[in-house]
């Protein structure tokens, strides 16, 4: 059973998948930072200071012992107030679109690379080259 597991792990697809998952997780953090720290603040700047991440609709009552800000999504959420955080959803949707676009670009580049590899004609084997040279010499002589 251990040998079967070792053979399974050593297959290229499993190792490739593991590497892809690790790189994907790291890439997700990069895209989240890009969205949260660059894109959304720029959108906020051009829309007059609009901060999407703090937009929400409160669905329930605020507890009597609540000490946070009634305009803070994080404070209300931590207090257990039911909320619809549509601003946070917009941020996550932008993250998804960025990741999907980059994955599309990578897949497209790989497909183009594979087409270029397929388009190259295969070089003839050495024996075929030798036979062609012999045939050419024989045609010259006779």
UniProtKB/Swiss-Prot annotation:
Membrane recorded as keyword: yes
Signal peptide: none
Gene3D superfamilies: Large-conductance mechanosensitive channel, MscL, domain 1
Annotated InterPro entries: Mechanosensitive_channel_CS, MS_channel, MSC/AndL, MscL_channel
UniProt keywords, alphabetically: Cell inner membrane, Cell membrane, Ion channel, Ion transport, Membrane, Transmembrane, Transmembrane helix, Transport
Bilayer disposition of the protein: Multi-pass membrane protein
Predominant location: membrane
Recorded GO MF terms: mechanosensitive monoatomic ion channel activity
Source taxon at top rank: Bacteria
CC terms in the record's Gene Ontology section: plasma membrane
Task performed by this protein: Channel that opens in response to stretch forces in the membrane lipid bilayer. May participate in the regulation of osmotic pressure changes within the cell.
Quaternary context: Homopentamer.
Stated name of the protein: Large-conductance mechanosensitive channel
Organism: Rhizorhabdus wittichii (strain DSM 6014 / CCUG 31198 / JCM 15750 / NBRC 105917 / EY 4224 / RW1) (Sphingomonas wittichii)
